[in-house]
Amino acid sequence: MSFLTVSRLAPKLLNSKNATYFLVAARNASASSTNLKDVLADLIPKEQTRIKNFKQQYGKTNIGQITVDMVYGGMRGMKGLVYETSVLDPEEGIRFRGYSIPECQELLPKAPGGEEPLPEGLFWLLVTGQVPTEEQVNWVSKEWAKRAALPSHVVTMLDNFPTNLHPMSQFSAAITALNSESSFARAYSEGVHKTKYWEFIYEDSMDLIAKLPCIAAKIYRNLYREGSSIGAIDSNLDWSHNFTNMLGYSEPQFTELMRLYLTIHSDHEGGNVSAHTSHLVGSALSDPYLSFSAAMNGLAGPLHGLANQEVLVWLTALQKELGGEVSDERMRDYIWNTLKSGRVVPGYGHAVLRKTDPRYTCQREFALKHLPNDPMFKLVAQLYKIVPNVLLEQGKAKNPWPNVDAHSGVLLQYYGMTEMNYYTVLFGVSRALGVLAQLVWSRALGFPLERPKSMSTDGLMTLVGAKSG
């Protein structure tokens, strides 16, 4: 049994008498090395062989049908790409390399005295399929601290952006400008063999993840804190702690929230706009800086990364109209009026999920523990009790349950981060963990240039035998 197989089996056996054995096996699978690149170098040939054998045996096997509705409907439900790091189940929610969010919260290493998983541990899991040890997570923290410094031209660029340029535009532009530092672009121009691509993609990805909090914090300070300094990286602190320090937040609970936030927003399988964009652009052998910058331009779209902002705007309007504490009956009437006016209740529903988003649930649990009496949280909790039943009565929603965006903005507001335009930047910092872990594997497995076949409406009509008149 391979190490990856042991890791994938572990969550299925959590409730069995063999759970301890398998979890120890998963943790010890790479215990001999704290260097992530060394662990990858051992895993990649095994995975290459496994996939080669699978393709040889099943390469011509049909895995589903494509309907006209799928082609016109944003390719929803169409099985069209391989994405290893996470899988989204409509009933269960996201699993990171086979592990649910509650399992990640339980198993991944935490900061001393902390209760939430460290994003460094999740990144190790996404890259290797293995639950890391504390030593391995500490290695990642120190590695990212070592790589965090920004080149002077990027600092100058950030300091000279106009203040009316959206934070996401600044974020994307700065990431693109980091392309000057790309190990992969340099190696490719020098003719490196394709079997070595992954090594340089890995180096660029580690550098980029390390630098993202510095970019994000610089944008925040320039826009909302009069350009004050972000300070220096402390190599003794974890990635999230350094990030919150650079942002200017010293409350330990906010750092714990950031660890949770950066973990749960990291990946959501490969079909969403940001993940698919990075996969597509990366397939052209664009380096990680260009690929991730493109992904961030997708994340900036209102249908992808702005949803938590829209939730807060809606909640604020609701609070203003209805006042403080609101009866369930008045709340129910307000929701019905919203729906009857042709609007939606933001934060409810999901393109894939058909149950409450587990990312919502873990944020709710955080709020119940740390801010149970906050008026905005109480409003969110009241909506959770009422909205699904109203949506079920209406009969239009495929999923009447809350998603991750229904909660995250309220938590950030509670700790003083009220700048809603900035929230998508936090989302972007987190999403790097998933899409860059996959980008390393995409090059390691030799995935080709993505080039699906497009069709015109006339062509589709001809294909299905429809009249074009």
Swiss-Prot record:
Pfam families: Citrate_synt. SUPFAM superfamilies: Citrate synthase. It catalyses: oxaloacetate + acetyl-CoA + H2O = citrate + CoA + H(+). GO terms for biological process: carbohydrate metabolic process; citrate metabolic process; tricarboxylic acid cycle. Pathway: Carbohydrate metabolism; tricarboxylic acid cycle; isocitrate from oxaloacetate: step 1/2. It comes from the Eukaryota. Gene3D superfamilies: Citrate Synthase, domain 1, Cytochrome P450-Terp, domain 2. One of its GO terms (molecular function) is citrate (Si)-synthase activity. Key enzyme of the Krebs tricarboxylic acid cycle which catalyzes the synthesis of citrate from acetyl coenzyme A and oxaloacetate. This is Citrate synthase, mitochondrial. CDD domains: ScCit1-2_like.
